[in-house]
Amino acid sequence: HIYHCLTLAYNLTGQEILFVTKEQHEPGLKKLQEANMPVHTIKSDEEFMEFVQEWKPDVVVNDCLNTEADYIKELKKYVKRVVTIEDLGEGADYADVVINALYEDHTRGDNYYWGSNYVCLRDEFFCATPSVFHEQVQNIVVIFGGTDPSNFTKRIYEMAKRIHKDYPEIKFH
């Protein structure tokens, strides 16, 4: 999420940008500081609302998964526009804009923007050489970004071990 938000911030040059994050999110906080981005730390959602009331931003870009309706409604009392990213929670229905680049749904409101047309790519990816497409699958890599609280990695690994017996020519990494 941090890299996504940094990419967005880099592309909003000329705008006053401030990152607000919970102080316990140390790796993300460190990355923002390394990127020389202005950062304000908070301890709770309540403290965030107090900060927003005081700072009075024009737009809040909220990169939180599964927001609750009450949270977004409260935020909209103090902010002109609320944008949420990768948000499938009920709160997203109350945001002004929802950008869900990782999902292809299209069944929710007009404030939703779905799919790969809305991905924020870092500059490094524009320079990358596309991989050669192989008709025959030879290698499979499964990567879940960030944390894995549902232990999907282990579940996928166990499935790959079972599949590998039927397809010994495929390498799982």
Per-segment meaning from a language model:
Residues 135-173:
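Donor-nucleotide binding loops and adjacent catalytic segments primarily
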Residues 1-13, 154-161:
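Histidine-anchored nucleotide/phosphate-binding helix
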Residues 94-151:
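A nucleotide-sugar donor-handling region in carbohydrate enzymes
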Residues 16-24, 170-173:
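Short internal beta-strands
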Residues 4-11, 21-112:
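Active-site and donor-binding regions of nucleotide-sugar-utilizing enzymes
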Residues 75, 91, 133-134, 165:
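Generic structural signal for beta-strand residues in well-ordered domains
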Residues 1-4, 25, 40, 106, ...:
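Histidine (H) residue identity feature
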Residues 14, 56-57, 79, 137, ...:
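A general structural motif
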